[in-house]
Amino acid sequence: MRYDSGIALFDAVTDIDEALIEQAESYVFPKAKQRLFRHIGAAAAALVAVAGIGTAWALFGAQNGGMLNSGGYEPDYVYPAVLPLAALNNTAGITTERETDIDLGSFLTGQPPFYWCGEVTDSYTLTNTTDGDITVQTVYPYIGNLAGMNDEMPAITVDGYAVRTEIFVGDEVWDADIGEMFTEEQQRDKLTADGEYLQKALAGNISLDIPVIAYRMTDYGYSGDRTPNDPYTLAVRYDLVGHNARILTTGFDGMHYDNDTGLYRHSFFLPHNEYEDYPYPRYIIAVSGDITNIRIEGYKNGGCHPGEELGGVYGSVERVETTLSAIIREYMEKTEYYNERGYDLDLLMSKCDGVLRQHYILGGDDVQTYRAARLSEIIGEAVSEDHVIYQRFDVTVPAGGSADISAVTRKKADWLSGNEGRYYAVKVAPAYSISLDYTSQTACVSDLGHLEMITPEQDYTDRELGTEPVSLEPGTGNYEVKVKPVSKTNN
């Protein structure tokens, strides 16, 4: 809410009604997800996701955990590896060489882990050994989310010229087995049989033209006098109709379900005037069912407890038969955040489908919990969750000639703990010669900038990257460079 005086604002922030605290305690949130190490899950899941297109590798090589320091526990942050190029069509007669350059001279200074990253140039030379031109349908995958897609998407060039790519976004990659390692044979047999993940992504956006019944709040308010600090609340109680009925809401602050009576209640703080009201409609949306016995109630605050009823609160409910896609589109079009960032609404709605199924709003199972969710949280999760994002483009390799492909990415570095203390790491995933015949794969660090490599004996593996090119061997897991700021004693 917006207030006219600093004193009123101070009072509103510091003088919190106990009922509001109780309301927060009783609110039923959708299924929670642990997001602290979500990037670990994303990297592991990409092993399954990207391997389905014919290129498989062991992606998960970084550690989970953290360390104690003078400021308390500091968690590790793990980001996905640089993923290799793959092809969708038969590429017989094409050989591929890969060179990956990690430039740490562009590392940004600042507080870890969010402002430390380098520039990675992942280069490929496709050579045609036949006497006819061959067009390769290539896909370059990376792991990211819709919120950062414009900033994190690799810049693709072919023979030095920028190319326009077609974007396909797979399902969320959080739910795959974390850290599971596969042998090359297992990856070929288990992961590349049908390419289910990519095929689903290539199928395009999922339609949410699902019939729903929406109840829109109209003409609501309070007929009496009130001060700017009065958290007067309108509540809507109703009965749920339908064995598998689910509820979505927009514009409601609180939700309560009475296990004894089976009654649902949604509530919101009444605005003081039209300028304080939400810019989008307040809906109770029934999915796969309906609601009945709707009652409008007023309360002195958001706790909505017996004995705190308030007369003078009024409101009307308009019943609308529509579709879920129409509701979501209306919400996003009237929400400044989504309009300013230029999201593809069809793509975003398609990703909402997966989140709605995770929260049991869609799917049809008889689940007695999580039967209601806020639409804003569903959309927010669809924007922030990680997916394998594919950039698809065609490359024609002339007979007896070659074509050079380059993908430049601003790559976030892992922030990890080890025997040498805190350090940064950038990972590169090798490719299997399944969809493309890789004759060589190398990676190296071209510029360390103000960093130094760490390769302590107790942490050393044969997958360490350095300033000299290192051959990447499929089936051995990620290769990585470990670095830390140059110590003062070495300056």
Predicted regions: what is each one?
Residues 1-34:
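Disordered, charged N-terminal biogenesis/targeting segments of membrane/secreted proteins
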Residues 5, 12, 16-18, 40, ...:
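Short linear motifs in intrinsically disordered/low-complexity regions
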Residues 18-24, 28-29, 48, 134, ...:
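Residues in flexible loops and secondary-structure boundaries
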Residues 31-60:
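Internal signal-anchor transmembrane helix that establishes type II topology
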Residues 57-491:
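Lumenal/extracellular ectodomains and adaptor appendage modules
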